[in-house]
Amino acid sequence: DIAKAKIQVVMGLSGSGKSTLIRHLNRLIEPTFGKILIDKKDVLSLSKKELLLFRQKNMSMVFQKFALFPHKTIIDNIGYGLSIQSLSKDVRIEKASKWLKRVGLEGYEEYFPNQLSGGMQQRVGLARALATDAEILLMDEAFSALDPLIRADMQNILLDLQNELHKTIVFITHDLDEALKIGDKIAILRDGLIVQDSDPQDIILNPADEYVSDFIKDINRARVIKAKSIMSKISKPVKGSLSINQNMVLEDILQEITKNPNKDIMVENNQGKTIGKISIKELLNGIKRPDTK
């Protein structure tokens, strides 16, 4: 199941079935069996006309290679999905201009794709997908072709927009750092099958098998694992202790400890209530790379 208004990451090695899977969701590739249920309606039961309408209204897609129309201006590229919905030109321009501004490209309305950098073109692709106001966003290796700094910038733009829009996003990637940064849940594929589907913390702390362990073995655990994932539960704080938020990562906890040595570490929720404590042993075990078989 993919949770509504969350980012579901799907990752795996090349050839594991990631891109095939995402194209099954909107039937760009026809599934051979099974069901695709969206709000209890089976996408496989839709007629050609119903499927076309479903793609126009309910689901948008962002591709790795941008897929912009080279002969259309940026504003017309963003408004393309709206033109298919038969909206008037004034409405299309208004909506497209809004999303162009949201992705930081105001002033580029009359440019053509070949006049923009790769990162700028992918911003246009994201704006085009969002302009249709579809509830579901499919992103197939959307940032993989970008330089590291531009990729990080696009990840931040996506997260900022998601905090406001609460879309249901299926995000395909082979980059574990990217998956851990943006995913509410991560599904790891192997030969078309899901090996593990869990939240990022659980993936790192409790890999399902050796295949998943190999995926995560080189990750900097201190930058990923949060206090709430390794704490022991308690309800009353210790007097004179160091209080940290449940979402603080271990790397930042270490920084706090160097400023406040010899203090017990208490973990608080977002309301400031003590919910646990962390011992030095728990902290070190969280940072330590698990033993390989």
Show which residues each predicted segment covers:
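Conserved ABC ATPase "signature" C-loop
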Residues: 191-192
